[in-house]
């Protein structure tokens, strides 16, 4: 087994000394921003944001700072869920995004926190929310739960 890197084949594992094998690197999960640039996901995203009002450019394009998405199960359904934020302003402008496992639906919860010193200690009291993609109560609960898992969200 080999892994192709450019035009050179790489060994799947590296032997560093007799009897010791170093495992091959595990491919990392793409970030939410990378997922949103894949054709199927990008098309769904563009359809979702098309009629949304008051949506900033970074959110409309799905281009922001993000970490790897997670595959989660919620209510017996599977979703790809992750966050995306405005570059250089993640604490005040971010969103949680969920794609259905069949890639046919996407929903979002955009959060804007007022730029006030008091918001640092208790951002939820200074937040406004915008639902994207018309999520039902179950999807709203899932996205809200993702937001509330953040230890900095008080």
Swiss-Prot record:
UniProt KW keywords: Periplasm, Signal
Signal peptide range: 1-21
GO cellular component, one term: periplasmic space
Gene3D superfamilies tied to this protein: Inhibitor of vertebrate lysozyme
UniProt key word Signal: yes
Keyword Transmembrane: no
InterPro entries: Inhibitor_vert_lysozyme_sf, Inhibitor_vertebrate_lysozyme
Compartments where located: Periplasm
Family the UniProt entry places it in: Belongs to the ivy family.
Stated name of the protein: Uncharacterized protein YPO2857/y1376/YP_2723
The species this protein was found in: Yersinia pestis
Lineage summary: Bacteria, Pseudomonadati, Pseudomonadota, Gammaproteobacteria, Enterobacterales
């Amino acid at each position: 087994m080999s892994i192709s890197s450019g035009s050179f084949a790489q060994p799947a594992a590296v032997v560093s000394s007799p009897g010791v094998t170093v495992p091959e690197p595990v491919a990392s999960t793409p970030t939410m921003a990378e997922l949103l640039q894949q054709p199927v996901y990008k098309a769904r995203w563009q359809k979702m944001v098309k009629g949304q009002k008051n949506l900033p450019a970074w959110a409309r394009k799905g281009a922001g700072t993000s970490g790897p998405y997670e595959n989660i199960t919620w209510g017996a359904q599977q979703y790809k869920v992750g966050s995306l934020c405005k570059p250089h302003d993640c604490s005040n402008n971010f969103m949680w995004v969920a794609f259905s496992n069949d890639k046919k639906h996407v929903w979002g919860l955009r959060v804007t926190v007022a730029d006030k010193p008091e918001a640092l200690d208790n951002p939820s009291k200074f937040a406004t929310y915008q639902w994207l993609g018309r999520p039902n109560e179950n999807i709203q609960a899932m996205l809200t739960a993702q937001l509330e898992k953040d230890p900095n969200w008080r």
